[in-house]
Amino acid sequence: VRENRNRSMKTNHILLILVSLVVIAAVAYMLTSAESPEVYQEKIEAERERQYKFIRFNVESPLTEEQKRDFKELNFYPIDPNYKVKARLIPVENRKVREVPMTDGSVERYIEHSYAEFELGGKTNRLLLLQSVSESDMRNFFLAFADETSGRETYGGGRYINARQDGKNSITIDFNLAYNPYCAYNPDYACPLPPKENILNISIQAGEKNYKD
């Protein structure tokens, strides 16, 4: 009996050690996988550099050759991690195709997919996530929005974010990655306008600012 009891105690002790190791490993993983402020800063800066090179050098750039010759830089707000938010996904009931107005008066077709609900600026905000009718990856969304900086510090026709679902019922929206549509650089382009649901009553002082010739 004593031998069985000792064996049982040893087994429980081993299980306790294994559980402790699993917990320690999980905590270590969370700590090492969490993005440090320095890594986050570098990631945003790298994306901005990529964006600059595309606008400055790529043949698909919206800039004319004359604009490219005079082009010096893109204008951004300082990087602020507070503008990276985790939003709750709320599926749109009875999803339908919406004809989104373009800056030239035409329309482009998108699916009304979900609402992204998040806290920012001391209030609860909600943005409509659209999905192109030709999108093959169902986790990718198109987000066009305007806010209280629009028409002043940022482009009056709104800004865009390429959003990707990263949780079962959630999505990360990083306003530091907000960028201008092509028509902000060249009026010969036609660009989707933000839906009325996506006109925010707060200032989003993050991402790209007005383009200056």
Report each predicted region and the residues it spans.
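Short, Lys/Arg-enriched N-terminal segments with co-localized hydrophobic residues
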Residues: 1-8
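Positively charged n-region of N-terminal signal peptides that target proteins for export
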Residues: 9-14
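Hydrophobic membrane-insertion alpha-helices, especially the h-region
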Residues: 15-30
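Ser/Thr/Pro/Gly-rich low-complexity linker/stalk segments immediately outside membranes or between
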Residues: 33-46
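Extracytoplasmic/periplasmic/luminal assembly and interaction segments
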Residues: 47, 62-101
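Mid-length scaffold segments of soluble, non-membrane domains
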Residues: 93-157
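Acidic, glycine-rich flexible loop segments
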Residues: 143-179
